[in-house]
Amino acid sequence: MDYNFKAAEKKWQEKWEEAGVFHAVDNSDKPKFYGLVEFPYPSGAGMHVGHIKAYSGLEVVSRKRRLQGYNVLFPIGFDAYGLPTENYAIKTGIHPRKVTDMNIAKFTSQLKKVGFSFDWTRVVDTTEEGYYKWTQWIFLKMFENGLAFRDKTLVNYCPSCKVVLSNEDSQGGKCDICHSEVVQKSKDVWYLRITEYADKLLDGLNKVDYLPNIKQQQINWIGKSRGAFVNFTLKDIPETLRIYTTRPDTLFGVTFMVIAPEHPIIDKYADKIGNMDAINAYRAECAKKTEFERTQLVKDKTGVCIDGLTAVNPVNGKEIPVYISDYVMMGYGTGAIMAVPAHDDRDYAFAKKFGIDIIEVIRGGNIEEAAYTGDGEMVNSGFLNGLDNKKDSIARMIDYLTEKGIGEGGVQYKMKDWAFNRQRYWGEPIPIVHCPKCGMVAVPYDELPLKLPEVENFDPGSDGESPLAKIDSFVNCKCPKCGGDAKRETDTMPQWAGSSWYFLRYVDPHNDKAFADYDKLKYWMPVDWYNGGMEHVTRHLIYSRFWYKFLYDLGLVPYEEPYQKRTAQGLILGPDGVKMSKSRGNVIDPNEVVDAYGADVLRTYVLFMGDYEKAAPWSESSVKGCKRFIDRIWNLQDILKDGDAYSEKLESAFHKTVKKVSEDIETLKYNTAIAALMTLLNNIYDAGEINRAELKTLLILVNPFAPHVTEEMWSTLGYGEMLAKDASWPAYDPEKCVDSTIEIAVQVNGKLRGKLVVAADISAEDAIAAAKADEKVQSFLTDKNVVKEIYVPGKLVNLVVKG
């Protein structure tokens, strides 16, 4: 009888839902397991095979944990705010709410069709009022505690999307959303003071189990450095230019300074500057460039020497010129840098172009040809001369700066405060009122959620204002503090807001009194295992850890870190080995695979196709191979015999497979776990039969990968009503995982001359004797003297001969 996968899959998906077999139980006496996958953005295109791979890893772990007796929380939801939905609404006139609901329904149907064991009673939707009420609530807590603030600054602005972008959302000078060029624009911006948590974010990495490359990317993103702040005085002006450097030991080599074109000192002393026209012209050119364009290392150096501003090197008293240049940004460091052209490539190129002195202070290179960026003996450096240990030189200089009152040791971070507002409609309204008398005032907590008003036109204003700014009934309000006329904030939060705490809401998704009950958080948190894409290990992972640590400081969550473990899956490439894209026509639709082969085949294939953590191309022939695997499992019914224990011929194979599959699932080696099951299947067919005890174990081992066919066989063959409810994960006996015999190679003078099957615990003496007695080997020993005998236990015998 052929396996009717369409009927079986529909049947078991309905049965699981009716039985509530995947529902997590709060505060159970069982050990808990909280497995988390990144909730999807519900796009109109629906799910792609990348979603399937991303969710299938922890799907297998979660099903295994349930069979091991754990109380499992494996939830799903929808990160549904975002520009693509709003852009679609602008294009079609369909309200984002309606679009979002349609897309969520589509995703839900697709996820259920694949048979994922999510707890569907805990679904969250970031656009639902009961959810974003608490997103706004957390924002107000940050505002109360000084972590949410507003500042006028140059921002990355996308003229196409008409929205302000964070540095993270505009990498490479391109908009993350529409990929058009980003420009600089002066604007009031909401920030979250994530830099206040930089050290806590770094320290927390020592307490969690993240993949090494994930941990390193977070460390690099935060970018903590140690160095010194140094004050450079200005000639005839009562001001200092304060800089930060990681190499204070090179101060004697400073021959010029560079400040950002936006530095306030320029306008403050404009009357003393003799070339303001040239400076203003240069500043106008800089304003047209994105931050990415300005800070590229490989580009022509441009700048203007400021006529009227001269700095003084604090360690040798030499007067040095001050330039403006686009590669210095006000938002990074202090907006001013010291330049040591002999030992910095960018400073060297700048000095060469503008004819500035280059003074060697570290011996080791040829500064006539290039900057020397290595270590060496200090020269031309006064009290540092002769030192050849960088650490000692830096420490000595910091002591000197501190003693003279011209600087001090310090720390800087590459990570900047998080630009947190967007000029769009489809996002969480920022619950702040602007009052001419009281300033910025929080919307009272009992008035949350501050709801999005109904609008007919979602187009942003031509000046980059939010569509909300055009709705007088929303904008005009009373100040919650004084009762006077006021105006609401019209910017909305970025998509990152809702995803920064969703894992907490899963714990208690229907609570209208708090974002989650503390006792439930204490039971379920931290997340035991979080899997997601490598593209989110900096922005999302850092943002959500920041929100969580803030809530921890308020005593609202019970543990220091939200995620105990974080892993990542590799991409599924197109059949051509290139990243899937509509333009290349190499996109695989998971619905088509399910319709043609069944959900179990799709689930098995995405985990069998290669190393889970690495990219792998789609292969239709391998999909068919997984279909044969499922069919062979089904056809075991044709050779089924009675038996309540493993047969002698298959006992060792079963114990080994249980061990292998159990261990491989825990280490992301899903492909080798499936390969082990395929090998066991071959052993069974070679034996010509399988008994009921053996098939029971096999069905349980296969179930996390292919739950539908295993449930159908479990029920049909009378093992029980439902495998997911009745079964327990099998154990193995370590002693029965050891082979009684092994195959060893026999070499003569290093060349393979034969193979032997011997006892696994054979002694060296007996192994060598057996090798010499082998007929094939003896022909290579005739008339030869054996001068050396080597036995590598369990591997080989090598006989070295002469003659």
Where are these regions (language model features)?
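Residue patterns forming the tRNA-binding/recognition surfaces of aminoacyl-tRNA synthetases
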Residues: D2, K11, K15-A19, K91-L241, ...
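N-terminal catalytic cores of NTP/NDP-binding nucleotidyl/phosphoryl-transfer enzymes
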Residues: V25-I94, T100, V123-I138, T245-T246, ...
